[in-house]
């Protein structure tokens, strides 16, 4: 079983994560957000790289917000060391010299990804929004139901309010960065940008450049900003942006031309199948690999009676098309959503209704049912696809799920070792 944590249900505000879990599977919501079970096993490489990359980003933006405190560029490795200690990658008194090679590799990938992001023309963070004297850089925000109704216009129907009020005081969230872009703070017509950064260890392709459908995460955070007045009390437009940053390794020429390379196909040329590649490859690297391998093949077949094997017209065409495709790939890709306030109100009400439904079931003595998914790579069948899959599937049905979960807890299979969320700060500002 994966190592778990268990604490009494101390959730006081609804988060976007709780809404997503409530919509996805009642049993998982029941285990995580009502019984308080949390997965606390070691994080995988993507999660580690993402956490360390966010630490670098936060250090950079905070330096922009307070240039008098930072006389020079921020120390990314110092920021990552603090994050590594907080998330228990390292002991509280450990240093980088005590880190494993895997952790050092992850830190190097995160450092490179942060540098790629900051130097990208897509990165326009210059002036973060300041709330209660603090820049909104990975700061946890809380808003009560009264603030949401008064500032955001999020007035809950009576049935929804009766289900939520006894259990939840309001909403909470931790936006990555909220900023004004290149505009001056005094420019009231300038929009507020709500950025969510994803550090991807695998290539990301086909990310839409713009989307008119309200994103649930953006809608949720927009309600928080409106309730706390961070959007100029409704005078500023809020634009939600998801920024995908490639944080994996880049393939080199040697990856293709080394003897026995697995990235060379039977024709002797470099593969164009990106699923076989361990990372992204730049167009100029693949072009040079194709040239070297083609020349190597031609020399190796020079003694053939029919002459050396030369590239065919089809091989030339496919290579040029792939090179052109690679030239359009970006290490930083941005998706934009313009958040219409009326639409966002409906989206967030639906999200809150999912949590209210689960709470009402528990209040009525009904254990929320499981949502079993059995297709290939589904969370219920994929190894480590769900944090509570083992005790959930060990039960004989939803009716005795609580007993099964508590039995696992009583046997000591769930341990208390709570990890903080990415970017959480203990001294984050709360709504007054």
What are these regions (language model features)?
Residues 1-432:
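RecB-family 4Fe-4S metal-dependent nuclease core
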């Amino acid at each position: 079983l994966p190592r778990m944590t268990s604490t009494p249900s101390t959730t006081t505000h609804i988060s976007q994560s709780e809404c997503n879990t409530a919509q996805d599977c009642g049993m998982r919501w029941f285990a995580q957000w009502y019984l308080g079970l949390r997965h606390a096993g070691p994080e995988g490489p993507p999660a580690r790289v993402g956490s360390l990359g966010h630490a670098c980003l936060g250090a950079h933006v905070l330096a922009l917000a307070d240039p008098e405190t930072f006389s020079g560029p921020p120390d990314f490795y110092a920021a990552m060391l603090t994050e590594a200690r907080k998330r228990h990658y390292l002991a509280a008194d450990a240093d980088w010299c005590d880190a494993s090679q895997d952790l050092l590799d992850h830190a190097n990938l995160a450092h490179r990804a942060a540098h790629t992001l900051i130097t990208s023309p897509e990165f326009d963070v210059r002036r973060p929004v300041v709330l209660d004297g603090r820049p909104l850089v990975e700061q946890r925000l809380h808003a009560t139901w009264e603030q949401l109704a008064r500032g955001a216009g999020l007035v809950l129907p009576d049935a929804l309010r009766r289900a939520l009020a006894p259990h939840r005081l309001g909403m909470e969230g931790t936006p990555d960065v909220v900023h004004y872009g290149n505009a001056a703070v005094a420019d009231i017509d300038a929009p507020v940008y709500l950025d969510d950064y994803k550090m991807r260890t695998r290539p990301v392709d086909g990310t839409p450049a713009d989307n008119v459908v309200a994103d649930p995460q953006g809608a949720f955070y927009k309600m928080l900003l409106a309730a706390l007045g961070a959007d100029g009390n409704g005078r500023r437009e809020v634009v939600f942006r998801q920024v995908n940053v490639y944080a994996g390794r880049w393939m080199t020429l040697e990856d293709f031309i080394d003897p026995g390379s697995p990235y060379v196909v039977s024709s002797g040329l470099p593969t164009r199948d990106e699923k076989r590649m361990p990372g992204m490859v730049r167009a100029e690297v693949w072009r040079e690999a194709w040239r070297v391998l083609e020349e190597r093949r031609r020399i190796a077949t020079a003694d053939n009676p029919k002459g050396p094997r030369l590239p065919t017209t089809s091989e030339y065409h496919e290579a040029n098309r792939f090179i052109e495709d690679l030239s359009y790939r970006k290490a930083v890709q941005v998706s934009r959503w313009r958040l219409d306030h009326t639409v966002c109100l409906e989206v967030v009400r639906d999200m809150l209704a999912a949590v209210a439904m689960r709470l009402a079931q528990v209040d009525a003595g009904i254990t929320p049912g499981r949502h079993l998914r059995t297709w290939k790579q589904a969370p219920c069948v994929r190894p480590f696809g769900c944090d509570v899959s083992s005790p959930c599937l060990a039960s004989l049905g939803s009716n005795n799920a609580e007993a099964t979960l508590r039995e696992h807890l009583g046997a000591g299979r769930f341990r208390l070792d709570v990890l903080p969320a990415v970017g959480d700060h203990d001294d984050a500002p709360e709504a007054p």
